[in-house]
Amino acid sequence: MGIFEKFKLGFKKSADNISSGLRDIIVKKEIDDETLNKIEEFLISSDVGIDASAEIKNIISQKKIDPKKNAVEEINAILKEYILELMVPLERKDFFENKENLNVTLISGVNGVGKTTTIGKIGKIFKDNGSEVIFSACDTFRAAAIEQLESWSDKIGAIIIKSNPGSDPASVAYKAIEHAKNNNIRRVLIDTAGRLQNKKNLMDEFKKIANVIKKTDESAPHDVVLVLDATSGQNIINQLEEFDKIVKITGLIMTKLDGTAKGGVLIAVSYTHLTLPTTP
């Protein structure tokens, strides 16, 4: 199943909400300035973002909507085309492909976004594709996080490298990579803490893990994936910017898209950070 088939399923609630909202707004056959402004306001309220909403409004204003046709359907088609043009270049088709050499993926994100569950699901795909996988339990600040990752490793048959709660997370990452090298295992997924005593400590620890990884392999981490919760709205833009300042984010995973009618935030993220690939 490709990225847009998955979006179709996860985006259904948002798509239904947008279609319903457009039907409420568009009561005239001609799209005048007042209607355009209402469409823009509605898109902003759906978490599409100010800049992307303004661009969509401008695109609609330049299109000639046939008054004989259903205006809602016409605008829905414009939105679909816009989203496709925005996101197709960002799809990471190579992310789940088998690798010939060691591949270390650092998974980041704040608590509650579904990081550990996401790691488990990614690990299962790697296993199903024939790759052995190591989980590195670097969220040592929460015993529950280690236990949850261990549960996933048991479930899918992955190897887990862990330590006692409170241990140095970077040392756990180092041991995981060394174990991978010594046993010719090519996939390492590193779980990280989502919340420490303050934001500076969180970012310092995240950077430390990345630096230690690089010492074991100059090309690592090969991917730094940020997990974002779609229900968090525009706040995820700030999360992305904060993490990207510390370690360059190479991919995004959006969770809980099926749990919100305001999934437009994925459009906002894609528009704001066109250089960042998205992983479904």
Regions found by a protein language model. Name each.
Residues H273-P280:
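Single conserved hydrophobic/aromatic residue that forms the stacking wall/gate
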Residues P221-V227, V247-L257, L274:
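Conserved beta-strand/loop subsegment of P-loop NTPase cores
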Residues P169, A173-K215:
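Phosphate-binding/switch loop-helix module in NTP-utilizing enzymes
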Residues D204, E241-K245, L257-Y271:
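GTPase G-domain guanine-specificity segment
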Residues M1-I25:
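Charged, compositionally biased N-terminal leader segments and the immediate start
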Residues K207-D229:
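Inter-motif core of Ras-like GTPase G domains
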Residues N17-C138, A145-P165, S171-I190:
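Primarily NTPase-proximal linker/entry elements flanking Walker-type ATP/GTP-binding cores
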Residues C138, T192-A193, V227-T231, L252-T260:
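G-domain G4 guanine-recognition motif of GTPases
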